Amino acid sequence: MVAVSAAMTQGVGLKGFAEKYPERFFDVGIAASHAVTFCAGLAAGGFKPFFAVYSTFMQRAYDQILHDVAVQKLNVTMLIDHAGFVGEDGQTHQGLFDIAALLPVPGMTLLAPADDVELKQMLAFAYLYGEPLAIRYPAKICRSFGAEFRFGVWRRMNEISSDIALLAVGGRCLDAALDAAEILASQSIATEVYNCSTLKPFDEDCLKALESKRLVITLEEGVKKGGFGEAVAARLRKPVCIGLGVDDKFVRHATVEQQLEENGLTAGNIAGIVKSNLF
């Protein structure tokens, strides 16, 4: 196993690894595109490379992800840090396009942990996985949910049975979904909440079960066009499917809390949408 950075050793949390295993760490400089090609070469040579990169900088390497990794079906794992809202890092550093960019890539597996426990389990899974894989996570992990990672499974996070389902991507969306379910429960409205930690491939069994629902709402810290919500809606025929995320706009400089509120990813807004579609 080797780790690769593109001049972001400290930012992506690889400083300790670099100091402990200098012979297994490579910083290629401000060259994200080259970093992906470099990882492809390492994988072709029998190594297991992990490339840690901010979501916004991953965009620079899309061509290399497609042609050097995905086409070749190489054993490269991309750790997409700072995915989702990054608050006051600025407008250009929001990590909002990686889901829409990676979902259509043939052979690419895409994961999104809800908390640090699930992230660690995904890293262990990635080490044994033999195909192109990306794991997206925010700059700061949300509270712990005790999430247990099961590849390809959208895990239900409450014991409630309902014809309303909230599908959450990532910890902050899951947090909002669970809080929304509590608000609705206080008004005698039952709501199922799912942790969709495997974005690709889809949980086909869960999709079949969702066909019987009345209302499905997806939540993601990313653009709605081409995102997880649109992909889910394309697969469901019967239920009303509403996708929450970022509309066709660039997100303004603000705190993460403000960005979540301005893009509808709060418990109160989610609960309001559920009620407005039931009555």
At which residue positions do the language-model features occur?
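Thiamine diphosphate
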Residues: 1-19, 33-37, 58-59, 71-94, ...
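Conserved glycine-bearing catalytic or ligand-binding loops at nucleotide- and phosphate-handling centers
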Residues: 112-127
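Arginine/glycine-rich "motif VI" loop of SF2 helicases in the C-terminal RecA-like domain
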Residues: 44, 70-71
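Glycine-rich, histidine-containing beta strand-loop boundary motifs that form or position
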Residues: 53, 80-82, 114
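Short catalytic-loop micro-motif centered on adjacent basic/acidic residues
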Residues: 2-4, 25-27, 50-53, 109-112, ...
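Extended, hydrophobic alpha-helical segments in both membrane/secreted and soluble proteins
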Residues: 13, 25, 32-52, 61-64, ...
